[in-house]
C-alpha cells in the first residue's frame, strides 16, 4: 500500500501510476494499456490563501482565524462572503426546513454544517445555496467522528476535505468526455456551486458557534463541541460577523487511467470490470490505498488461475482510476467516452474504493440486479472478525443479511456506472460501529488504519477480496448471467401503493394511476416469462446462452430515461438517478397532495408520471423482445 500523498497531476501521482502499470505488465495478462485525458481540476492558489475572519460593523477585520492552507473543497466557488452565521446541523433538507419553520433565515448568511448525516459536502453546499446562503463552512463534530487522540480519534484542529461538485466527472464537460482533442462547447455542470465553501476544524467551529445568539436548536442537533450552547444564530453576541474568502484556481491536469485485461474464451466482448481510485489529496490509506492493493491482488489471482488452466467465458477488466478525489473524474470521463457501447459490453462493475474502514459490518451499495450474486457470496466467505462464521451467518445473528444491501450514493465509485451508464454496479465496504475518523484528512495513514483494526487489515482486505472474487468468478463462468432481472418491480410496487392511496384525488384531477400499474405488471410478467424461457432452454448451446445474456445485460440500461438530456441531466436512471424524471422525485411530488396541496403542480406531475411510465413500459417491452408479443394500451388521462 502507498504511504504518501498522491494527488492527480503531481510527480508522486505520476510515479504511482507508473508503478501500477509495471505491476500489471508483470502479470502478463492479455492486454495492458493506459488511457490519458486532460481534465479541469481545482487546487488552492499557491500564493493567495483562503481565509476566515471576524469583522466588525464597519467591515474591518477584528480577528483572523487560522486555517490550514492545504484544506480546501475542490470546485468551490471563489470569492468572498460576509454575513451572520447560521448553524444548520448536517445541512440536510429537513434541517433547512426546520430553520425555515422556526423563522430563521439563512439568506445572506454563512452556514455552518457538520460532516456526515448521510449528506455529501456537495449536497450540503447545494442545499445551503438553494436556501439563499452566501457561504458554507463544514466541520467534523466529535459526536460523529471520534476526536479523542488517546483512542485513535481525529485531532480537534484537523479539518475534513471533500469536493463540492454535485455530480461526477469534469464539470466543464458534463455528459461528454474530456479526451484529448475534444472540441469543448462552452458549457459547465449545473452542479458547480455558486457560493464559496471551506472545510474547518472542530476548534474553529467551536470558536464561531460559541459566540452565536438566537433561537435554541432541537435537542437532536446538539453537538459535542466544548463550551458551545446549541443556538442557531444568525447573530453574534458581540455584534460581529464572519468573512470567508476562497482562492482556488482551475487547472488543466493530465489524468492517466490504467487498464489490464484477461480475454474470455466464449464471449470475449462481454466483460466484468473491477476498479479502484488511485489518487488521494492526503495519504489516502482508506481512500485509495486499500482498494488499489485489493485490485492488484485480484488481478494477480485471476491471472494465476488462467495460467493454471482456468478459462473464463467472459473477459475481466482491471482498472486503476485517476482523479477520484475530485468526483470520480477519471472513471466518469471513461464512461462518457464509451457510453454508446457499454450497455452492450459491460456485464457489471465492482468498485473497491474505501473498501476497509473497519472489520465488523459489511455494506454493499449496489444495483438490486446483483443481490442474488451477493447473497451467494456472503454464504461462502468467512467473516474477518468472527473465525469459523460466514458473513451471512454473522449478519443473520445481528438482525438479518438484508441489512447489508444499501442504495448507491452519489460519491460512490460505483454510482456513475449505474446512474449514468446503465451498468449494474456495486461498492463493498467493511466498517464498524465506531466511525473511522480519518478519511479525507492528512491522518488517513496505513499505520492508523492498522491500529484501528487491531492489526487485522490483511485479514479484512482478504475477506473483501474473496467476496468480490466469488461474484466475479460466477459472472465470468456461468452460462447464464446470474442477475435478478425482476428486482426493480418491487421498487415500483412500493410506489404503486402510494399512488393507490391518492387514487381518488388523482382521478379528480384527470390523472389515472392505472398506466403505472399496467406498466409494472407488464415488466413483472416479461421478467417472469424470460426467466421461464431460460429455465426451459439448453443453456449449453452457445447461441441460446448468448441470446438470453444479451437481454439480461441490458436490463439496467432500460431504466435510463430517454426523455432527459445526458448533458443537462447526466444521471438518467429513473430509480438511482437525480432529477425530476426519477421515481423519488415523483414520490416526493405525490406526497405534496397530503402535506402541502397548494404546491402540487398538476402539469408537472402529469409530465413526470408519463415519462416514468414510458421508461418502465419501455423496459417491459424490451424484455418481452418481439413486437408481436407486446400488447400495450396507452392511457394516462381521462
PLM-predicted stretches and their roles:
Residues 317, 434-493, 594-636:
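His/Asp/Glu-rich mid-to-C-terminal helical/loop segments that flank catalytic regions of hydrolases
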Residues 33-34, 85-87, 110-114, 135-139, ...:
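Structural recognition of the beta-strand scaffold that forms the well-ordered cores
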Residues 2-110, 117, 140-143, 148-177, ...:
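Noncatalytic luminal/extracellular "stalk/propeptide" segments of secretory-pathway proteins
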Residues 59, 163-216, 267, 321-450, ...:
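Metal-dependent peptidase/peptidase-like ectodomains
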Residues 67-98, 174-286, 300, 304-308:
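Soluble metallo-hydrolase cores and metallopeptidase-like ectodomains found primarily
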Residues 2-12, 71-76, 87, 112-125, ...:
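Second-shell loop/turn segments in exported
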Residues 274-329, 333, 468-471:
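Alpha-helical metal-binding/catalytic segments enriched in His/Glu/Asp
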Residues 545-638:
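C-terminal amphipathic alpha-helical interaction region
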Amino acid at each position: 500500500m502507498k504511504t504518501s500523498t498522491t494527488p492527480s497531476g503531481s510527480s508522486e501521482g505520476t510515479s504511482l501510476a507508473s508503478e501500477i502499470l509495471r505491476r500489471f505488465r508483470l502479470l502478463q495478462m492479455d492486454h495492458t494499456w493506459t488511457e490519458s485525458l486532460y481534465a479541469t481540476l481545482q487546487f488552492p492558489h499557491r500564493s493567495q490563501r483562503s481565509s476566515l475572519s471576524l469583522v466588525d460593523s464597519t467591515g474591518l477585520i477584528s480577528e483572523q482565524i487560522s486555517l490550514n492552507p492545504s484544506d480546501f473543497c475542490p470546485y468551490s466557488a471563489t470569492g468572498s462572503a460576509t454575513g451572520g452565521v447560521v448553524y444548520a446541523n448536517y445541512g440536510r433538507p429537513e434541517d433547512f426546513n426546520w430553520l425555515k419553520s422556526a423563522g430563521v433565515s439563512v439568506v445572506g448568511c454563512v452556514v455552518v454544517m457538520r460532516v456526515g448525516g448521510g449528506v455529501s459536502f456537495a449536497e450540503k453546499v447545494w442545499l445551503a445555496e438553494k436556501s439563499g446562503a452566501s457561504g458554507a463552512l463544514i466541520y467534523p463534530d466529535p459526536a460523529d467522528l471520534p476526536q479523542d487522540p488517546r483512542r485513535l480519534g481525529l485531532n480537534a484542529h484537523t479539518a475534513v476535505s471533500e469536493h463540492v461538485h454535485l455530480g461526477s466527472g469534469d464539470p466543464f464537460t458534463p455528459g461528454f468526455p474530456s479526451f484529448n482533442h475534444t472540441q469543448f462547447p462552452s458549457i459547465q455542470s449545473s452542479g458547480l456551486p455558486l457560493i464559496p465553501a471551506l472545510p474547518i476544524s472542530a476548534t474553529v467551529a467551536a470558536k464561531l458557534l460559541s459566540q452565536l445568539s438566537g433561537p435554541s436548536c432541537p435537542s437532536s442537533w446538539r453537538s459535542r463541541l466544548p463550551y458551545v450552547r446549541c443556538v442557531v444564530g444568525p447573530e453574534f453576541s458581540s455584534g460581529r460577523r464572519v468573512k470567508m474568502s476562497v482562492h482556488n484556481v482551475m487547472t488543466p491536469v493530465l489524468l492517466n487511467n490504467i487498464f489490464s485485461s484477461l480475454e474470455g474464451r466464449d464471449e470475449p466482448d462481454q466483460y466484468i470490470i473491477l476498479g479502484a481510485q488511485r489518487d488521494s489529496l492526503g495519504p489516502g490509506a482508506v481512500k485509495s490505498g486499500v482498494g488499489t492493493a485489493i485490485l492488484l491482488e485480484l488481478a494477480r489471482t485471476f491471472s494465476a488461475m488462467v495460467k493454471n488452466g482456468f478459462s473464463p467465458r467472459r473477459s475481466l477488466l482491471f482498472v486503476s482510476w485517476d482523479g477520484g478525489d475530485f468526483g470520480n473524474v477519471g472513471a466518469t470521463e471513461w464512461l462518457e467516452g464509451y457510453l454508446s457501447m457499454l450497455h452492450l459490453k459491460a456485464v457489471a462493475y465492482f468498485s473497491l474504493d474505501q473498501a476497509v474502514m473497519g472489520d465488523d459490518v459489511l455494506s454493499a451499495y449496489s444495483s438490486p440486479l446483483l443481490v442474488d450474486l451477493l447473497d451467494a457470496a456472503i454464504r461462502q466467505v468467512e467473516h474477518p472478525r468472527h473465525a469459523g462464521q460466514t458473513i451471512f451467518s454473522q449478519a443473520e445473528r445481528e438482525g438479518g443479511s438484508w441489512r447489508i444491501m444499501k442504495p448507491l450514493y452519489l460519491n460512490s465509485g460505483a454510482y456513475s456506472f449505474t446512474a449514468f451508464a446503465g451498468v449494474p454496479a456495486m461498492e463493498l465496504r467493511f466498517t464498524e460501529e465506531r466511525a473511522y475518523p480519518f478519511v479525507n484528512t492528512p491522518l488517513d495513514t496505513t499505520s492508523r488504519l492498522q491500529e484501528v483494526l487491531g492489526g487485522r487489515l490483511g485479514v479484512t482486505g482478504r475477506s473483501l477480496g474473496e467476496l468480490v472474487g466469488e461474484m466475479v468468478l460466477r459472472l465470468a463462468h456461468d452460462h447464464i448471467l446470474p442477475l435478478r432481472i425482476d428486482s426493480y418491480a418491487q421498487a415500483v410496487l412500493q410506489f404503486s401503493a402510494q399512488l393507490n392511496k391518492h387514487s381518488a384525488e388523482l382521478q379528480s384531477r384527470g390523472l389515472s394511476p392505472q398506466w403505472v400499474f399496467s406498466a409494472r405488471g407488464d415488466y413483472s410478467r416479461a421478467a417472469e416469462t424470460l426467466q421461464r424461457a431460460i429455465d426451459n432452454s439448453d443453456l449449453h448451446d452457445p447461441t441460446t446462452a448468448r441470446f438470453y445474456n444479451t437481454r439480461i445485460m441490458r436490463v439496467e440500461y432500460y431504466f435510463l430515461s430517454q426523455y432527459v438530456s445526458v448533458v443537462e441531466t447526466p444521471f438518467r436512471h429513473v430509480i438511482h438517478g437525480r432529477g425530476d424524471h426519477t421515481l423519488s422525485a415523483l414520490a416526493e411530488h405525490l406526497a405534496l397532495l397530503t402535506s402541502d396541496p397548494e404546491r402540487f403542480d398538476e402539469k408537472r406531475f402529469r409530465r413526470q408520471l408519463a415519462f416514468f411510465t414510458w421508461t418502465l413500459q419501455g423496459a417491459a417491452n424490451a424484455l418481452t423482445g418481439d413486437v408481436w408479443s407486446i400488447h400495450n394500451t396507452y392511457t394516462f388521462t381521462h
